[in-house]
Amino acid sequence: MAKNYYDITLALAGICQSAHLVQQLAHQGQCSQDVLKTSLSSLLDLNPPSTLAVFGNQEANLQFGLETLLAVLNSSSRQGLSAELTRYTLSLMVLERKLNASKTALHDLSSRIEQLDRQLAHYELDSDILLSAMAAIYVEVISPLGPRIQVTGSPAILQNTQIQNKVRATLLAGIRAAVLWQQVGGGRLQLMLSRNRLVNEAKSILARLDGTPT
């Protein structure tokens, strides 16, 4: 069966978007609220009609992730911020496989997300209450699966509880995107064997957003 590289690229961009948000939060203590909301919202749509629907049905919602994806695929750097992005992205993929292998964790995650959905009736998605709840899901359901993702950045920033919660909530969103990536036919071998297909697909989507003919 032929792979749908459009869906695969969108889901992969979702992973990369979360990875880059984590990096920005850890180093700068801030990130785009709109981009963050796109990633966090993806946690609540577990039965989407399409891959794009997970991210609000707008390709523009993944522009940040698509640009990050190109940076990751085109990078040969083994050091610095680029290497950090690649490490976060690959670590999320590894954790997703651990999650997929644990029926208990999958059940726990599903029930906790349902609780989260109910809380959304009373609180804003990016409220401290919901960010704390999402962070708790990551710490209690995902982290024990191991290996833990070591987030690096400014020690002063990373000691801030609100930043810690945002980072963990964003990592949880990255796991959601990694689950989606597997569901639409994604796999780590593609990063090497189908790199050009992924690059071209990402460039094509970005060109549409810019209004540039492809």
Swiss-Prot record:
The keyword Repressor does not apply. It is a peripheral membrane protein. The keyword Nucleotide-binding does not apply. Pfam families: DUF489. It comes from the Bacteria. It is found in: Cytoplasm; Cell inner membrane. Residues 81-130 form a coiled coil. Keywords: Cell inner membrane, Cell membrane, Coiled coil, Cytoplasm, Membrane. GO terms for cellular component: cytoplasm; plasma membrane. InterPro entries: HflD, HflD-like_sf. Its main location: cytoplasm. Belongs to the HflD family. This is High frequency lysogenization protein HflD homolog. It comes from Erwinia tasmaniensis (strain DSM 17950 / CFBP 7177 / CIP 109463 / NCPPB 4357 / Et1/99).
